[in-house]
From Swiss-Prot:
<feature type="domain" description="SpoVT-AbrB">
    <location>
        <begin position="29"/>
        <end position="74"/>
    </location>
</feature>
<dbReference type="GO" id="GO:0016070">
    <property type="term" value="P:RNA metabolic process"/>
</dbReference>
<keyword id="KW-0238">DNA-binding</keyword>
<keyword id="KW-0378">Hydrolase</keyword>
<dbReference type="GO" id="GO:0003677">
    <property type="term" value="F:DNA binding"/>
</dbReference>
<comment type="function">
    <text>Involved in the degradation and recycling of damaged RNA. It is itself a target for degradation by the ATP-dependent protease Lon.</text>
</comment>
<dbReference type="InterPro" id="IPR014944">
    <property type="entry name" value="Toxin_SymE-like"/>
</dbReference>
<dbReference type="InterPro" id="IPR020883">
    <property type="entry name" value="TypeI_TA_SymE"/>
</dbReference>
<dbReference type="InterPro" id="IPR007159">
    <property type="entry name" value="SpoVT-AbrB_dom"/>
</dbReference>
<dbReference type="GO" id="GO:0004521">
    <property type="term" value="F:RNA endonuclease activity"/>
</dbReference>
<dbReference type="GO" id="GO:0003723">
    <property type="term" value="F:RNA binding"/>
</dbReference>
<keyword id="KW-0963">Cytoplasm</keyword>
<dbReference type="GO" id="GO:0005737">
    <property type="term" value="C:cytoplasm"/>
</dbReference>
<comment type="similarity">
    <text>Belongs to the SymE family.</text>
</comment>
<keyword id="KW-0255">Endonuclease</keyword>
<keyword id="KW-0694">RNA-binding</keyword>
<protein>
    <recommendedName>
        <fullName>Endoribonuclease SymE</fullName>
        <ecNumber>3.1.-.-</ecNumber>
    </recommendedName>
</protein>
Length: 110
C-alpha cells in the first residue's frame, strides 16, 4: 500500500489546454522529381499573441518526437559608427593603417 508521503501532489500544467494547438504534418513537393517532403504550416493571430509577430526570427530545436520553437529577441540597432568599424576590420592591414591615418588627421592628433 502507498504511504501518504509517496503520493504525488497535484500541480497545474505549464500550458493551459486553451493554449494547445493541434497540427497535422502535411507535405510539400520538390521540383523536378516532385518528391514529397514533410511540412508543418502554422498561421493565426495566436502566433503574434505568443510573441511570434511577422518578421520575428525563430530558433528551432529538434529532438526525437519534439520540436521547440523559440522567438529570438530583436537585436538593438547598431550605430553607423559601429557598422563602419565592422567594415574596416574586414580590410587588409595596409588599408586599416590608411583609415587610421585618416582618422588621426581628421582628429588633429598628428
Amino acid at each position: 500500500m502507498t504511504t501518504v508521503h509517496s503520493i504525488a501532489d497535484p500541480c497545474d500544467p505549464e500550458v493551459s489546454p486553451t493554449n494547445n494547438r493541434h497540427l497535422t504534418v502535411s507535405y510539400a513537393s520538390r521540383y523536378p522529381d516532385y518528391t514529397r517532403i514533410p511540412a508543418l504550416t502554422m498561421k493565426g493571430q495566436w502566433l503574434e499573441a505568443a510573441g511570434f509577430a511577422t518578421g520575428t526570427e525563430v530558433d528551432v530545436r529538434v529532438m526525437n518526437g519534439c520540436i521547440v520553437l523559440t522567438a529570438q529577441q530583436p537585436q538593438p540597432e547598431e550605430s553607423e559608427l559601429m557598422q563602419s568599424l565592422r567594415q574596416v576590420s574586414k580590410l587588409s592591414a595596409r588599408k586599416q593603417k590608411q583609415v587610421q591615418a585618416f582618422i588621426d588627421v581628421m582628429a588633429g592628433s598628428k
